[in-house]
Each structure stands twice: as C-alpha cells, then as structure tokens.
C-alpha cells in the first residue's frame, strides 16, 4: 500500500532497511526490535487518543487501551521490582524533564555528570532545558583511572548541597555503585535520580546491579539494551507516584502514544523470558571481547582500560585521526559508530578525540565473541590502512560477508 500511496517514502524506507541489513551497527544506543514489537507499534492503536491514565481517561472507547497500558505497567514492575511505573513518556529526555518538574523548582541546585565524562544533555548541559532551567553543578571521572570519582562527588555534594543528584550516563563503560550514590545523597538530604537508559536491559536481567532499591526515581528509555520501541519510562517509590504522574500528564504531555506503549508491553514481556538473560550476558561478553582486542593495539586506547557493560570509548589520540574522521571512514566500509568526547577532551564536540562502540545490535543479530574480535580487528585495519584503496575494499567485502552470515531476519535472539 505504501509503495502505491507514497513511493518516495517507501523507497527511502527500503533503502534504510537495506542499510541496516548490510551495515555492522555499533552505535551503543541502537538495537534491533523483534518483529512482534514492530507489529505492535505499527498497529491500529495509533488511531486512538487516550489522555489520562487507565480507568481515568478523558476520552471514551479506551477499554482495550486501558488493558494494554496496564499490562505494560505490570510487566515493567515485575521486570524491575518497582513500586510505581509510568510508561507514557515519549522519550528518555521527557522522562527526565518530568522528574525535574515533579520534584524541583526552577533554579534548584542539581549535581549531574559532566557530559564530556559520559553524562547526558539532560543532566545539565547549558544547551539543554535542564541547564537552562536549573542550577546544575557537575562531577566526573578521576584522572587516574577514568572511573567515577565518588570521593570528589561526595565533596562536591557537601559544597553545593544540591536538592537532587542525577547519575547514569550515555558514554560510561563501568559498573555504577548505586549504594554509594545513595549514601552521598543522604548525607546532603538530596533526591537521588538514576538515568539507566543505556543499561536498562542489563539491569532487568541482573547483569548490572539495579538502581531501583536505592534511587528515589529511576528514568530510562525503552530501546537501547532493553530492545523495545523508542520511548521513555519512569520508575519511582510509591510516595512520588502522584507527583510523577501529574508531571507527565497534564504537566508536559497530552495524549500518550498507545501504539508505542503496546510495543513497550511486548518488549517487557520478551525481557521477562530466559532467552533475554542469555542475550544481555552475550552483549557484555561481546563488548569485553572487542575491548580486549583494542587494548592490545598501539593505535587506540580503551578509556578506563575496559568495559563492564555494553559499550566502550576509544581514545584515538595515537591514531592520527579524530572521531569524526574515523566515523566517516568506517561508514565507507559499512561499519556504523559515532564520534564521542572522551574524559578531559581537548577537541570540539564536532570532531572529538574518540568514538563510542556498543554491542546490543550486533548481539541481536547473533554475533559472538569471535565475530566481535574480527570486527575490532577490521576497525584497527581501517585506522592503519585508510589511505589504501585496495585494503579498504577488502575490509568492506569482509564486513558484507559478516552481515550476510548474520542476517537480521534470522537473528538468534529475534522471533
């Protein structure tokens, strides 16, 4: 139908589908949803308006919508052990915005992770609403090991006395010590909000410790390692439920995207299966296999010396390339990464000294450790031989052979 109604859009979708099939996707925030998740999101639920919450709607005809949203909520509660869950946020950024609005006043002091050290725009960037509406102070990693500097964070908290401490990251490869963060927050009487967007899938299966018992509020996206549709979610203690729900609706959103919420419910159901635990363990094993290869090279340096989760940062200082240059070179041989700042960055965010690499999407295709070691070696080969046409052609052919070997439609962890 789409091909007939709008052939231009249809053709572009087909081209994107072809790109995904024939590229090795290493962007840490991307994944490949199951056919069931995709089917739910493309359903007739997109036709339905449902302002409000289950059994408290401002529109009629929501009897099935209520059941679907309730299922999403209950599955998320089971998955993460949360008192209360709101599945309506359209994105992780909107989930974070709602938490700030629910618990803070404009101008309140917040302590968040420095973007350069691995934080997120919504954790206080001056270019983001968070840094414009609230008085953010930053903490980061230690210069000795590039891991979170909890002592420095605690000292900063004592100095600033923030009303909230925000933790979680978009480019941090190590396990986060949530009990320590709770202790620091309690010492200054601050709320503790954890943004677990990147590690939610790992948390769901116990591969990464859970922030839920320690945080007042936890926000997340529902894609990335959780392998659901693009969207957001908030988990909180029961005492904050009313404030959080009111901040989402009518605070910052109107009608929820019920077709996306249905897809979230499906993804949560998938994450409750034993196969998903095996999948998340493989994500980490694959990332560690890649990091081990990079760690043996003189061309790159693995930030913090390794990874405990799904991603790693590579310092390209010794390679003669910046992040943007390597991103473009890898694109030319069908490997997708993103340029990324590294701790104590010296280049602009439009160039960067590093790249970020993640394994969720390739693990969804069925890649194992040996395959990931091969990918790492291909990346090193691009760095070393990027000015040799014959070598780059051979690398491109090797990548296409791998993507043919692990087609998306036959991915091990998909239906």
Curated annotation (Swiss-Prot):
Pfam families from the entry?
SHMT
Single Gene Ontology BP term?
glycine biosynthetic process from serine
State the reactions this protein catalyses. Answer: (6R)-5,10-methylene-5,6,7,8-tetrahydrofolate + glycine + H2O = (6S)-5,6,7,8-tetrahydrofolate + L-serine
Query: Where is it predominantly found?
Result: cytoplasm
Q: Which cofactor does it need?
A: pyridoxal 5'-phosphate
The EC number(s) given in the record are 2.1.2.1
Q: Which UniProt keywords apply?
A: Amino-acid biosynthesis, Cytoplasm, One-carbon metabolism, Pyridoxal phosphate, Transferase
Subcellular location, in the record's words?
A: Cytoplasm
Q: Which residues form a coiled coil?
A: none
Which enzyme type, at the first EC level?
transferase
Tell me the route in metabolism or biology where this protein functions.
One-carbon metabolism; tetrahydrofolate interconversion; Amino-acid biosynthesis; glycine biosynthesis; glycine from L-serine: step 1/1
Which residues make up the annotated site Plays an important role in substrate specificity?
223
The highest taxon in the source lineage is Bacteria
Matching entries from InterPro entries are given as: PyrdxlP-dep_Trfase, PyrdxlP-dep_Trfase_major, PyrdxlP-dep_Trfase_small, Ser_HO-MeTrfase, Ser_HO-MeTrfase-like, Ser_HO-MeTrfase_PLP_BS, SHMT-like_dom
Q: Which CDD domains match?
A: SHMT
Q: Where are the transmembrane segments?
A: none
What is a GO molecular function of this protein?
Answer: glycine hydroxymethyltransferase activity
Residue positions of the PTM N6-(pyridoxal phosphate)lysine? 224
Where do the annotations place (6S)-5,6,7,8-tetrahydrofolate binding?
115, 119-121, 348-350
Q: Which GO terms describe its cellular component?
A: cytosol
Family, according to the entry, reads as follows: Belongs to the SHMT family.
Q: Subunit structure, per the record?
A: Homodimer.
This chain's function reads: Catalyzes the reversible interconversion of serine and glycine with tetrahydrofolate (THF) serving as the one-carbon carrier. This reaction serves as the major source of one-carbon groups required for the biosynthesis of purines, thymidylate, methionine, and other important biomolecules. Also exhibits THF-independent aldolase activity toward beta-hydroxyamino acids, producing glycine and aldehydes, via a retro-aldol mechanism.
Q: State the protein's name.
A: Serine hydroxymethyltransferase
Q: Which organism is it from?
A: Latilactobacillus sakei subsp. sakei (strain 23K) (Lactobacillus sakei subsp. sakei)
User: What is the organism lineage in this UniProt record?
Assistant: Bacteria, Bacillati, Bacillota, Bacilli, Lactobacillales
The gene name on file is glyA
């Amino acid at each position: 139908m789409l091909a007939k109604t709008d052939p231009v859009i249809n053709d572009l979708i087909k081209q994107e589908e072809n790109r995904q099939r024939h590229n090795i996707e290493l962007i840490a925030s991307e994944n490949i949803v199951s056919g069931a998740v995709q089917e739910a999101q493309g359903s007739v639920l997109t036709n339905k308006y449902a302002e409000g919450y289950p059994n408290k709607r401002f529109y009629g005809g929501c009897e099935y919508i209520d059941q679907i949203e309730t299922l999403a909520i209950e599955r998320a509660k089971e998955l993460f052990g949360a008192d209360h869950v709101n599945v309506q946020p359209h994105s992780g950024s909107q989930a974070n915005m709602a938490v700030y609005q629910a618990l803070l006043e404009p101008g309140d002091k917040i302590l968040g992770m420095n973007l350069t050290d691995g934080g997120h725009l919504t954790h206080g960037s001056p270019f983001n609403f968070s840094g414009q509406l609230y008085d953010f102070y930053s903490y980061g990693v230690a210069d000795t090991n590039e891991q979170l500097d909890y002592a420095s964070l605690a000292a900063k908290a004592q100095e600033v006395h923030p009303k909230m401490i925000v933790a979680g990251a978009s480019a941090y490869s190590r396990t986060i010590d949530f009990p320590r963060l709770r202790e620091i927050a309690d010492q200054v009487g601050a709320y503790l909000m954890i943004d677990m967007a990147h590690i939610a899938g790992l948390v769901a299966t116990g591969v990464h410790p859970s922030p839920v018992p320690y945080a007042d509020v936890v926000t997340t996206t529902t894609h990335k390692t959780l392998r659901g549709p693009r969207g957001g979610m908030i988990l909180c203690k029961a005492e904050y439920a009313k404030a959080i729900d009111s901040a989402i609706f009518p605070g910052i959103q109107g009608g929820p995207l019920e077709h996306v919420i249905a897809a979230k419910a499906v993804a949560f159901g998938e994450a409750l299966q034993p196969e998903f635990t095996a999948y998340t363990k493989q994500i980490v094993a694959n990332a560690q296999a890649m990091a081990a290869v990079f760690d043996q090279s003189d061309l790159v340096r693995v930030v913090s010396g390794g990874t405990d989760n799904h991603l790693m940062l590579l310092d390209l200082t010794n390679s003669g390339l910046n992040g943007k240059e390597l991103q473009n070179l890898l694109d030319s041989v069908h490997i997708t990464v993103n340029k990324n700042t590294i701790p104590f960055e010296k280049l602009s965010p439009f160039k960067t000294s590093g790249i970020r690499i993640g394994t969720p999407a390739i693990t969804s295709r069925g890649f194992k450790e040996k395959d990931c070691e091969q990918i790492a070696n291909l990346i090193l080969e691009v760095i070393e031989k990027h000015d040799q046409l014959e070598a780059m052609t051979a690398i491109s052919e090797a990548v296409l052979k791998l993507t043919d070997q692990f087609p998306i439609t036959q991915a091990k962890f998909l239906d």
